[in-house]
Amino acid sequence: KPAMQRGLTAGRTAFNKQIKSVYYVSPAVISRYSHIGYKKVEMRSDGLIGSIEYAGTVIPLIKYNVTPQKATYGKTPVKAAVKRSESQVELAKSFTAQMPNGHIGIYERKSDSSYPIKQLYGPSVPRMAENAVVLKTVEDRVNEVINNRMEHELDRILNGGS
């Protein structure tokens, strides 16, 4: 059980590192827009079961690799990239604006008139965690830590530890 718990902790760290390496997102943004939870490790008929759960909301597009980062006026083109493997793409009919409460975001008009406008968002942290590259790396890391800790726990018990 302690080996499984240590593996889940390592999995959480690996998720954050891997998400950061695949997407243009900072650790502060990951922690602000998501919640990471553990299902407690349980003994069932089919063995030990444990899981890591991610919950969170979509992240404003301005938090990714976007130019310009400040509010602009006129016909300044907005370019954005969400994944590190992709280059910035120009977003047609988008603009950067600062709202009265101070929030800066990437917006687009819903119609030809000035209002209403809607903010553009990137993927949420749970959606990023579903990426195949991220999942594979995290799974490998969790298995590696569990196997190492299992050996350590067995050695401890066999050598008379409590």
Question: What are the language-model segments listed below?
Answer:
Residues 1-162:
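Short, Lys/Arg-rich flexible segments
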